[in-house]
Amino acid sequence: MATTTTTTRATAVAGARIGGGAAARSRREAVLRVVAPVAVGLIVLGAWQFLVSVVGVSDYLLPSPASIVEEFVAYWPSILSAAIITGTNALVGLVAGTILGLALAALAARWRAIDLMSAPVVAAIAVVPIVALAPVLNSMFGADSQFGRQAIAALASFVPVFVNTLRGFRQTAPVHRDLMKAYAATSGQVLRTITLPTARPFMLTGIRIASSLAVISALVAEYFGGPRGGLGSLISTSAASSAYARAWAYVVASIALGLLFYLATLLLERLVQPHRTQPHRTGGGAR
């Protein structure tokens, strides 16, 4: 009896140590995820300032971080207004591209003929250069319309959402579908209980990738014409007038906008899949 009690206590202590070690490791990883990017950023900024202040790189080639911050503060109202315009274009394009990608992927997964017809179209859209498409759409929809930019963002968002969602729909094991059919489940029940839960991580991965592409495509579309006011057009105007520090300030705002979209999709992923601690990766399975 004493031996059994001792063994039980030893097992409990060992389990507590393992649990405590896992919790400590999790805390270290959480701290590292925050500290590592900050440390890298500080190192890059320090090297940047060193090149300008000590090495003597011209502001024409590389403005100093201090001058960029000064321009950022001085033109903050303009930066905020431009970020709202660009963010709206990117958001509209992201939503439209996501809806179109999800719908077409569902149809392609359901009917083989649609899959065969859509494959070359999606491949063609994926290789269309935004630099060539932006002036065309801006001219088609007029110099005062934002629709051309939103359409470009939608096309850029559509491809990753479609590809990842279609792959997710195809991950459902046939044995699971057969089992549901054996229980006389309807197509809607199979979709709700088997197909969608399996495909959800892939959908979210596609949306996360598309969020960054939507911002990039909106910026590029603004850079090549259309109504003024977005971050892309202000970068072009500032660079053309040799206000390079100001142009870099708009670039910093563009980076912040892209990060905001990315973090928003990460938050969406955490809300939709609260038990997942890591973002889903296209190259691997769910964790």
Residue ranges and their predicted role:
Residues 92-122:
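Transmembrane-helix boundary motif in ABC transporter permease subunits
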Residues 112, 170, 248-287:
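C-terminal transmembrane helix and the adjacent membrane-cytosol boundary/short C-terminal tail
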Residues 123-160, 167-168:
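Generic hydrophobic transmembrane alpha-helix motif, especially the helices
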Residues 1-29:
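Short, Lys/Arg-rich, polar N-terminal cytosolic tail immediately upstream
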Residues 164-203, 232-235:
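Short cytoplasmic-facing helical segments at TM-TM junctions of multi-pass membrane proteins
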Residues 151-155, 188-221, 249:
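Transmembrane alpha-helices
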Residues 28, 32-54:
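N-terminal signal-anchor transmembrane alpha helix
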Residues 21-26, 54-95:
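Periplasmic/extracellular loop-to-transmembrane helix junction in inner-membrane transport proteins
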